[in-house]
């Protein structure tokens, strides 16, 4: 199997010969790109342009780098996963619920932060959004004030929406080293994004414009998984499609958490 660098070199040559929009067939196994060809080879192929394939490999390289993010710590010590919900997206809703279950499977202790009453109708209102963040962040500081972060061998932050801003800001301000899963981040999230983070965004998310999220993720080298036509909950309204989305999303989450 070729390395990512070898695949990118092949793609650059093919793009010069046939153009960036030439269709090829990407071969994947367990969600990992293994190569590409000009004829479909079932069942592990998807049709894709050379340009999109190039972007897919870049994202996979970032994902592998984020998954393998490590820091000096006692790996035999307990592991802690902290859940940072959104304003209306609580810890028992699908993305956070299943991500928490995966973390528990890998022997993480689970701690869910909860917020008190926050301003309503904050969408599109910068002042209310700022107030909601400040209130939720203050409550987060209080909820986590007694934790000895140095006593844990591995730390994982799992967050959603405004919770991605809170989690990233908290980790940055307290210099907490660990991995972070960002479900439907906001643009403000990337002001604090740190190494070892991955993000998930729906292209129909009314809370965050896709081009802005894509640009910010690239600037911070945060691997970004885009779900076409999905909203702020990574849902489309089609039950079967939504079940497929949660399955694909959790496969990425599982690999990310499982990587030492």
Please report, for each region that a protein language model flagged, where it lies by residue.
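A conserved short beta-strand
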Residues: 176-185
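Serine-hydrolase catalytic machinery in alpha/beta-hydrolase-like enzymes
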Residues: 63-151
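Conserved alpha/beta-hydrolase "acid-adjacent" motif
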Residues: 206-212
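Short beta-strand/loop motif that positions the catalytic acidic residue
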Residues: 199-201
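Acidic, low-complexity, intrinsically disordered interaction modules
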Residues: 18-50
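Gly/Ala-rich beta-loop-alpha elbow adjacent to hydrolase catalytic centers
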Residues: 158-167
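Catalytic histidine-centered segment of alpha/beta-hydrolase-like enzymes
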Residues: 230-244
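Acidic beta-to-alpha connecting loop that harbors the catalytic carboxylate
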Residues: 87, 203-206, 229-231
């Amino acid at each position: 199997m070729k390395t990512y660098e070898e695949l990118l070199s092949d793609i650059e040559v093919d793009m010069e010969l046939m153009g960036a929009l030439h269709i090829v067939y990407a071969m994947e196994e367990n969600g990992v790109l293994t190569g590409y060809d000009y004829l479909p080879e079932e069942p592990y192929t998807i049709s894709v342009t050379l340009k999109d394939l190039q972007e897919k490999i870049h994202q996979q390289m970032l994902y592998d780098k984020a998954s393998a993010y490590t820091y000096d710590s006692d790996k035999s010590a307990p592991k802690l996963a902290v859940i940072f919900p959104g304003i209306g997206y609580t810890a028992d809703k699908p993305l956070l619920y299943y991500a928490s279950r995966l973390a528990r499977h890998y022997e993480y202790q689970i701690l869910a932060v909860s917020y008190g009453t926050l301003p309503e109708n904050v969408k599109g209102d910068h002042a209310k959004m700022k107030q909601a963040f400040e209130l939720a962040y203050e409550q987060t500081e209080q909820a986590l004030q007694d934790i000895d972060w140095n006593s844990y061998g591995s730390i994982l932050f799992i967050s959603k929406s405004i919770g991605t801003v809170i989690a990233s800001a908290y980790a940055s301000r307290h210099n907490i080293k660990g991995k972070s899963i960002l479900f439907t981040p906001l643009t403000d999230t990337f002001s604090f994004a740190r190494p070892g983070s991955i993000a998930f965004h729906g292209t129909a998310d009314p809370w965050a414009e896709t081009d802005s999220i894509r640009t910010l993720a690239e600037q911070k080298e945060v691997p970004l998984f885009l779900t076409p036509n999905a909203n702020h909950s990574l849902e489309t309204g089609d039950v079967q499609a939504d079940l497929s989305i949660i399955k694909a999303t959790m496969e990425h989450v599982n690999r990310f958490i499982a990587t030492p």
